[in-house]
């Protein structure tokens, strides 16, 4: 499925319900170079699948980030800019961010400041990470505090459920994204969530793909308001 999502004046195509490989078959990549930024954990889990999907595509490169959700910091940005320093300025590069919220923010920020970037895709491994891709701006942090903001101009978000983290508490953390949107925007949406995921068994067995469309609509209407819900309490707990 494809959802044409508006981040203010900025548009992004969100593709979900199909695999990354099937997307590539429909529209092969033609850029000269591909750089995939990924957390170490997701590189270990999914790099073979990504490499296979691209097939004989030349110029596929990996940049590995630490697993921390706060990897979108100044030191990591400086490191990846050094990594890209040898690329010719006139060479088209497709940037792909594969992983958690930190990698997605780092990739989208790099897309705006790199001398050689031409296109940016985000591949979140959770709904929590997908939420970050929906927001109109991304940040670079220092000591876990935002120091630089820039508009999020990523062109595509590919949410492949076969590349998501489904272990442990991950499904419950993803469900909280839907609950937060329901609390802020739509009480009937909360009721639907309770009926669809009444217990842990149903949560682990039922895909989120069937309810993503409405989540995207709610974020399109009030994404920043939803994202800020509860942040005051989080900040208070973090400083006590």
Regions inferred by a protein language model and the residue ranges of each:
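Short glycine-/acidic-enriched loop or helix-start segments at secondary-structure transitions
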Residues: 46-48, 106-108, 132
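ATP/NTP phosphate-donor binding region
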Residues: 1-93, 169
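Glycine-rich beta-strand-to-loop/alpha-helix junction loops that act as flexible
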Residues: 66-68, 98-100, 234-237
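A glycine/threonine-rich phosphate-anchoring loop and its flanking beta-alpha core
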Residues: 112-201
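Active-site segments that bind and position negatively charged phosphate/pyrophosphate groups
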Residues: 200-240
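Buried hydrophobic packing segments
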Residues: 80, 107-111, 178, 236-240
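Hydrophobic, well-ordered secondary-structure scaffolds
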Residues: 77-83, 100, 112-113, 128-132
């Amino acid at each position: 499925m494809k959802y044409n999502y508006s981040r203010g004046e900025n548009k992004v195509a969100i593709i979900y319900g199909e695999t990354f490989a099937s997307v590539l078959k429909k529209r092969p990549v033609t850029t000269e170079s591909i750089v995939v930024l990924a957390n170490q954990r997701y590189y270990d889990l999914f790099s073979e699948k990504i490499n296979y999907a691209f097939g004989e595509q030349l110029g596929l490169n990996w940049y590995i980030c630490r697993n921390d959700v706060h990897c979108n910091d100044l030191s990591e940005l400086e490191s990846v800019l050094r990594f890209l320093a040898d690329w010719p300025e006139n060479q088209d590069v497709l940037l792909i961010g594969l992983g958690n919220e930190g990698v997605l923010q780092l990739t989208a920020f790099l897309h705006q400041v790199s001398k050689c970037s031409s296109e940016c895709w985000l591949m979140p491994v959770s709904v929590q990470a997908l939420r970050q891709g929906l927001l109109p701006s991304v940040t670079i942090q220092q000591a876990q505090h935002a120091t630089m903001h820039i508009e999020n101009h990523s062109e595509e978000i590919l949410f492949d459920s076969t590349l998501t983290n489904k272990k442990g508490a991950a499904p419950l953390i993803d469900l909280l994204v839907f609950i937060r949107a329901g609390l802020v925007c739509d009480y009937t949406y909360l009721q639907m969530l309770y009926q669809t995921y009444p217990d842990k068994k149903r949560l682990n067995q039922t895909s989120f793909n069937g309810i993503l469309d409405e989540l995207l609509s709610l974020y399109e209407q009030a994404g920043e308001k939803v994202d800020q819900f509860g942040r005051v309490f989080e900040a208070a707990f973090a400083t006590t």
